[in-house]
Amino acid sequence: MRAVIQRCNWARVVNDGVETSKISKGMLVLLGVKKGDTEKDCEYICNKIINMRIFEDENGKMNKSLLESGGELLLVSQFTLYGDVRHGRRPGFIEAELPDRANELYEKTVEMCSKYVKVGTGKFQTDMKVSLENDGPVTILLDSQKMF
């Protein structure tokens, strides 16, 4: 499972011209599910999202987690995180999980994170317009199976 985590002042998702989800200060996380991912990957990603210390404390140091800062989470599925462009010019998505299983694990991750923080979501397998105001900017790449 792969995530692009962005600290933000606000973020929102629009589907078919209608705002479907919006958060204030917190994180926008783009989440890709890989073939072979399991609930263990969901647990790992959720734990990192909730507890990663990328929010400033009273001294201006990145010392607080999403949970500690009272921030919100916008979790958006994005299979293109597994796009492979090493060969040719058009990305291949052979590593991305099939839609039914990917949606199941995406929803499981949403459910897990919702136990700790307010979570907004995009609509799975739709064309979305995602906007945010980066804070920092702070952007972290996270993979449940490897380091970048």
Predicted feature residues:
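Short hinge/gating elements
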Residues: G88-A96
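N-terminal, polar/charged subdomain of small-to-medium soluble alpha/beta proteins
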Residues: M1-G88, D100, E104-F148
